[in-house]
């Protein structure tokens, strides 16, 4: 039990540190070309055991070689936190789909969706608040810090984008977000 609590505290400190860095020095963030397709493939490889345990099927539908100019650490945080959330909260025997559904001269448009349980409509507007939890008891048991989606939102904003969440008609949750090409 003490190991679990110290582990949770370590995750909390890490998440607070990431948020603080984003807020205090947004202009100090270094950028480089980042291949999002490869990054997402690597993330799915990292969580293979969790996916298998919950019988979750993941579909990385990002086009081969999709590369943007960005901060690799923050971009990783976006895709990893969305993946971790789907695994932790969407349920078992579901699927996760990541795709880039549109591109224009300035942005790539992404959808990160699952076929899980979704969330009550009253929670949708608050999902990105720090420490907000839809189900406080379950979140604590699963080890979440309540900062993952706040990190996602801030990282998306620092990459010139926007993000929102919606329930899907067949059940599940979908995050729609944009990332600037530059």
Predicted regions, residues:
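Conserved catalytic submotifs in the C-terminal HATPase_c
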Residues: 30-33, 52, 57-67, 103
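Short beta-strand/loop element within the Bergerat-fold HATPase_c
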Residues: 93-106
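Short conserved segment of the HATPase_c
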Residues: 119-133
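Short helix-loop "hinge" at the ATP-lid/N-box region of the Bergerat-fold HATPase_c
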Residues: 86-87
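Acidic ATP/Mg2+-coordinating residue in the GHKL
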Residues: 114
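Short alpha-helical segment of the dimerization/phosphotransfer core of two-component systems
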Residues: 4-9
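Conserved glycine-rich
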Residues: 92, 160-161
